[in-house]
Swiss-Prot record:
Name recorded for this polypeptide: DNA-directed RNA polymerase subunit beta
Superkingdom per UniProt: Bacteria
GO cellular component: DNA-directed RNA polymerase complex
EC class: transferase
Organism: Thermus thermophilus (strain ATCC 27634 / DSM 579 / HB8)
Gene label: rpoB
Length: 1119
């Protein structure tokens, strides 16, 4: 099929690798492929360097030192697929070469020590933890550094905040008090800053010289009593203020203040914080702490420059500004590598504590590095992070786009981040610096709006964690091909033009250019422009970039369109959209859903499970295909060959399509012929009418795989057994089980069918005399077992596609304590579209299938072509997502011309171009009608007359010309399939790309007659998972009260809820065909009575004759 490209803006640079934020970050943290001597001091290398050497605390013993030399990662013990199958973590062993130095003798013992395992990242940027694919979401937080913010309580005054890395030191606030004293707040304690300045060695003259320009502000520092002290005395005074309970000793005070501001192991601004502080204060720091400790004295690094800036800001000196904390120059991304390294550092600190304890306990001669180190705390810290951290999430792999988007997510939540409740509007809002860095559209709709966002398409995260976006340099009005990646702070210094600025060759064509400076629009001459956007795509995320005609959609609906694409279920017969945006191929390639050739060669063999390619150098390389693999969300991930034996392939050519891809293009749904018209109220309120033809053609059929699991345990009564020998069951019920009691592959199973047979020993009840006699004769044989088999839950079923048995003792299998074996059964369902399923397009138009019409009842074109879907026109104007109408028009042209289109966002097909294509399509459409011997029907002419009155067509033209006029508006005359008559007005018809979403009615359908009850309230449980009932709440009770439906209401509150005796009696009566008896006392009333009695109130229940009634009588036996 021919693909026609729109778009005038040249691609200057390709998109960066879409999973780069994950893959690069983790590669840099581990540096596994870098020789030890060439490793940078980042990631786990830096963590080792910070923790080691570990010295013995008791200096009197002569002293042991454990030092670190290098580390290496071994090979992972199990491949990825085996890890998924056996619930293992895909990880590699970590070894460190350590040396133990005896300081007094100079003896050195060297050893390679095993330090536990570190999870490895798969090539697509996710992890396999306990058999499940997981993604570590990047976190956005306030960058460490020095910040100046207005004091909310006192206008005209400011607070200076010095912020370290999370959990790497205290926040410090400096402010000028109302009485003029400059105070410092640390660990919730306030004291005069002058005390610390004296400790740092400043005297009155130095401060007067450095800060003399700010006359009265400096007076707040001039405390004569403090300057009369020596720095050592000021230190003791400071210590007593900060630690009032501790004895004021010099060494204690030095150690405390050192740990607070000068110890690199306990206080860390981080590289980003150091960079921000230097940039803000215009200084150079020697390290990442606030002060140094040299020759027994503290030396200042940050405090005086911060104070100088605070005074200048208060005094209104030009060039000194407050900080915008939502500016992306002040927020940074903590990617996987950094998050893991933080946990690794915590684990190493625990390991070091253990080492010091063992140094004190063991005899020096017998100690070796291996005996000193216990790797458990390190491994536990890493395991905790990957399995339980808020940022370690179950990977969303509904389709390739959802897994790609998950890896590009940025969250402000998580440890050290914000909480939903605390985050205000400012943090959630779009900021001008988001341009090209964070997508302004894609974010969830609920409580997390604005806190969870997505990285823009071209954005990259630099080594300090700041997001950079690319710009082309412009020199003297000429656009060069030099591309510069800039942070938000750097960007603020320049004037930047848009990507669609008109160019002649490389020179800016317009005399006046719309550009932006510090996020504000300005109109400038071409010579004033310094940079230019590289592409209109750079503003939005990958998901949003997949919405054609995005520029015609309201942002709220674009947000829904972006989010719903990730909920699209992969279909059996996937189709790429007729109207694409140009990113579809890249998404499939970077998500690793499809398979591509690694070199030039020839296809040697193809079957359903593998492709073998013979490369130029003679090597035969086998590519195994993933067939019907269950994703985390239960969708089927399946790869299908797209090559034939003997075909020549070049490097990067497609070998096999993956889920939701067609010939390497992302295919999340289907192109269907849509009519936008009301239809007898069936498409009221976003409901959708579809043709039965879609079901016959399997257009919206998807495969879903459910996993069922059962364990056989050792119980107190005896071991459970997986067996075919189940008591009280007919042979028919066991026909699909193999001799071991596991269902056979290929069996069709329905609700209630046995998947795995299991027997458990019955609980011991007091045996009857007859049983005791039998046991004394036959021994233990008479003890019985009960059937506890795994059965298909209600409302589910399908075809068994795979079974897995994991037994204790099998290689690599780790089962929970007490579990002997685990059996898993995978059941696949083929789901056709049905009433209640949710459909959506890319523009945020979503709805539920309300009616499936026979194809003969659907409206059809004059040539008999029936439409597939009928959408309600009222869904468009108020939602302002007109992109879908333009897509439909272009889709109509594509339908008749047999073309596909690539229409990039903000640079796509314009109205005249669509009209030109529609004119060509009309010739094909009408030419075909003429060729089949019928031109314009007289009933069509009546519709055209009505169209004349509405001003849709020009009066006086021939019917054919009028039909063409309508066609250029994307409208045609439709006939009602039920009556054969034309529909009154012209209707917009065309191809629209519609997806079937993950919310399928089959998963939500649920019914209950009787079932489990809550232990306390005795009311039915809630929810499908618990096989619960529907809650009849307070407001529903009011509704029945308002109608006076007394008997229905009483039944709701008693028999159908928590009247234990009544419901049992009612059940019995229904079975026997008798009348349902009167209700008795509900359990909630008894609970109320008991609660009142617990409050020492004497509550009695009386009948109508005032006789006492015991509502608790005989209850124990009935429960």
């Amino acid at each position: 099929m021919e693909i026609k490209r729109f778009g005038r803006i040249r691609e200057v640079i390709p998109l960066p690798p879409l999973t780069e934020i994950q893959v690069e970050s983790y590669r840099r943290a581990l540096q596994a492929d870098v020789p030890p001597e060439k490793r940078e001091n980042v990631g786990i290398q830096a963590a080792f360097r910070e923790t080691f050497p570990i010295e013995e605390e008791d200096k009197g013993k002569g002293g042991l030192v454990l030092d670190f030399l290098e580390y290496r990662l071994g090979e992972p013990p199990f491949p990825q697929d085996e890890c998924r199958e056996k619930d293992l973590t895909y990880q590699a062993p970590l070894y460190a070469r350590l040396q133990l130095i005896h300081k007094d003798t100079g003896l050195i013992k060297e050893d390679e020590v095993f330090l536990g395992h570190i999870p490895l990242m798969t090539e697509d940027g996710s992890f396999i933890i306990n058999g499940a694919d997981r993604v570590i979401v990047s976190q956005i937080h306030r960058s460490p550094g020095v910040y100046f913010t207005p004091d909310p309580a006192r206008p005209g005054r400011y607070i200076a905040s010095i912020i370290p890395l999370p959990k790497r030191g205290p926040w410090i606030d400096l402010e000028v008090e109302p009485n003029g004293v400059v105070s410092m707040k640390v660990n919730k304690r306030k004291f005069p800053l002058v005390l610390l300045l004296r400790v740092l060695g400043y005297d009155q003259e130095t401060l007067a010289r450095e800060l003399g320009a700010y006359g009265e502000l400096v007076q707040g520092l001039m405390d004569e009593s403090v300057f009369a002290m020596r720095p050592e005395e000021a230190l003791i005074r400071l210590f007593t203020l900060l630690r009032p309970g501790d004895p004021p000793k010099r060494d204690k005070a030095v150690a405390y203040v050192y740990g607070l501001i000068a110890d690199p192991r306990r206080y860390d601004l981080g590289e980003a914080g150091r960079y921000k502080a230097e940039e803000k204060l215009g200084i150079r720091l020697s390290g990442r702490t606030l002060a140094r400790f040299e020759d027994g004295e503290f030396k200042d690094e940050v405090f005086l420059p911060t104070l100088r800036y605070l005074f200048a800001l208060t005094a209104g000196v030009p060039g000194h500004e407050v900080d915008d904390i939502d500016h992306l120059g002040n927020r940074r991304i903590r990617t996987v590598g950094e998050l893991m390294t933080d946990q690794f550092r915590v684990g190493l600190a625990r390991l070091a504590r253990g080492v010091r304890e063992r140094m004190l306990m063991g005899s020096e001669d017998s100690l070796t590095p291996a005996k000193l180190v216990n790797s458990r705390p390190l491994e536990a810290a890493i395991r905790e992070f990957f399995s339980r951290s808020q940022l370690s999430q179950f990977k969303d792999e509904t389709n390739p786009l959802s897994s790609l988007r998950h890896k590009r997510r940025i969250s402000a939540l998580g440890p050290g981040g914000l909480t939903r409740e605390r985050a205000g509007f400012d943090v959630r809002d779009v900021h001008r610096t988001h341009y090209g860095r964070i997508c302004p559209v894609e974010t969830p709709e609920g409580a997390n709006i604005g806190l969870i966002t997505s990285l823009a398409a071209y954005a990259r995260v630099d080594e300090l964690g700041f997001i950079r976006t690319p710009y082309r340099r412009v020199v003297g009005g000429v656009v060069t091909d030099e591309v510069v990646y800039m942070t938000a702070t750097e960007e603020d210094r320049y004037t930047i033009a848009q990507a669609n600025t008109p160019l002649e060759g490389n020179r800016i064509a317009a005399e006046r250019v719309v550009a932006r400076r510090k996020g504000e629009p300005v109109i400038v001459s071409p010579e004033e422009v310094e940079f230019m956007d590289v592409s209109p795509k750079q503003v939005f995320s990958v998901n949003t970039n997949l919405i054609p005609f995005l520029e015609h959609d309201d942002a709220n609906r674009a947000l829904m369109g972006s989010n719903m694409q990730t909920q699209a279920v992969p279909l059996i017969r996937a189709q790429a959209p007729v109207v694409m945006t140009g990113l579809e191929e890249r998404v499939v390639r970077d998500s690793l859903a499809a398979l591509y050739a690694e070199e030039d060669g020839e296809v040697a063999k193809v079957d359903g499970n593998r492709i073998v390619v013979r490369y130029e150098d003679g090597r035969l390389v086998e590519y195994p295909l993933r067939r019907f693999y269950r994703s985390n969300q239960g969708t089927a991930l399946d790869q299908r060959p797209r090559v034939v034996v003997g075909q020549r392939v070049r490097k990067g050519d497609l070998l096999a399509d993956g889920p939701a891809s067609e010939n390497g293009f992302l295919a999340l749904g289907q192109n269907v012929l849509v009519a936008i018209m009301p239809f007898d109220g069936y498409n009221f309120e976003d409901a959708i009418v579809i043709s039965e033809e879609l079901l016959k053609r399997d257009f919206y059929t998807s495969i879903h795989i459910e996993r069922y699991e059962i364990e056989a345990r050792d119980t107190k009564l005896g071991p459970e057994r997986i067996t075919r020998d189940i008591p009280h069951l007919s042979e028919a019920a066991l026909r699909d089980l193999d001799e071991e009691g596991v269902v056979r592959i290929g069996a069709e199973v329905k609700p209630g069918d046995i998947l795995v047979g299991r027997t458990s020993f019955k609980g011991e009840s007091e045996p009857t005399p007859e049983e005791r006699l039998l046991r004394s004769i036959f021994g233990e044989k008479a003890r019985d077992v009960k059937d506890t088999s795994l059965r298909v839950p209600p409302g589910e079923g399908g075809i068994v596609v795979r079974t897995v048995r994991l037994r204790r003792g099998d290689p690599g299998v780790e089962l929970k304590p007490g579990v002997r074996e685990v059996v898993r059964v995978y059941v696949a369902q083929k789901r056709k579209l049905q009433v209640g399923d949710k459909l959506a397009n890319r523009h945020g138009n979503k709805g539920v299938v309300a009616k499936i019409l026979p194809v003969e009842d659907m409206p059809h074109l004059p040539d008999g072509t029936p439409v597939d879907v009928i959408l309600n026109p009222l869904g468009v104007p108020s939602r302002m997502n007109l992109g879908q109408i333009l897509e439909t028009h272009l889709g109509l042209a594509g339908y008749f011309l047999g073309q596909r289109y690539i229409s990039p966002i903000f640079d796509g097909a314009k109205e005249p171009e669509i009209k030109e294509l529609l004119a060509q399509a009309f010739e094909v459409y009408f030419g075909k009608r003429k060729g089949e011997g019928f031109g314009v029907d007289k009933r069509e002419v009546e519709v055209l007359r009505r169209a004349e009155k509405l001003g849709l067509v020009t009066p006086g033209k021939t019917p054919e010309e009028q039909l063409k006029e309508l066609f250029l508006q994307g409208k045609v005359v439709l006939y009602d399939g039920r009556t054969g008559e034309p529909i009154e007005g012209p209707i917009v018809v065309g191809q629209m790309f519609i997806m079937k979403l993950y919310h399928m009615v089959e998963d939500k359908m649920h019914a209950r007659s009787t079932g489990p009850y809550s232990l306390i309230t005795q009311q039915p449980l809630g929810g499908k998972a618990q096989f619960g009932g529907q809650r009849f709440g307070e407001m529903e009770v009011w509704a029945l009260e308002a109608y006076g439906a007394a008997h229905t209401l009483q039944e709701m509150l008693t028999l159908k809820s928590d009247d234990i005796e009544g419901r049992n009696a009612a059940y019995e009566a229904i079975i026997k065909g008798e009348d349902v008896p009167e209700p008795s006392v509900p359990e909630s009333f008894r609970v109320l009575v008991k609660e009142l009695q617990a409050l020492a109130l004497d509550v009695q229940t009386l009948d109508e004759k005032d006789n006492p009634v015991d509502i608790f009588e005989g209850l124990a036996s009935k429960r």
